């Protein structure tokens, strides 16, 4: 090397300008199933209308009420919905339809 020549060594380091983003296992949810009472005690109901949607037998079928394959309770006749407690400690609930002619 000559007297006037200089040797420079450049050491460049590049740093991340943005943090590396990872994925998450959260952030999703299932759609609600809209379970529960569709008709209240004392309401008028028509044949085939749903009274109660449920998983399992929380409410039992009484007179003029049938249970579908998914445990949904529905009316077998026109009338008025009546919920009734029964069992040894009144711990179970049954729904009945009191037959009543509805005006069309």
From Swiss-Prot:
Organism: Mycoplasma genitalium (strain ATCC 33530 / DSM 19775 / NCTC 10195 / G37)
Entry superkingdom: Bacteria
One protein family per Pfam: Ribosomal_L27
Any one GO CC term of the record: cytosolic large ribosomal subunit
GO MF annotations in UniProt: structural constituent of ribosome
GO biological process: translation
Protein name, as recorded: Large ribosomal subunit protein bL27
Coiled-coil residue windows: none
Keywords per UniProt: Ribonucleoprotein, Ribosomal protein
Proregion positions: 1-15
NCBIfam families: L27 (TIGR00062)
PTM comment text: The N-terminus is cleaved by ribosomal processing cysteine protease Prp.
């Amino acid at each position: 090397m000559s007297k006037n020549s200089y040797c420079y060594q450049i050491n460049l380091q590049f740093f991340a300008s943005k943090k590396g983003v990872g994925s998450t296992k959260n952030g999703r949810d299932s759609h609600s199933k809209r379970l529960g009472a569709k008709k209240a005690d004392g309401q008028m109901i028509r044949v085939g209308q749903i009274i109660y949607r449920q998983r399992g037998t929380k409410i039992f079928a009484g007179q003029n009420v049938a249970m579908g394959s998914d445990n949904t309770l529905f009316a077998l006749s026109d009338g008025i919905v009546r919920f009734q407690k029964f069992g040894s400690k009144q711990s179970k609930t049954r729904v009945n339809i009191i037959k009543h002619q509805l005006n069309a």
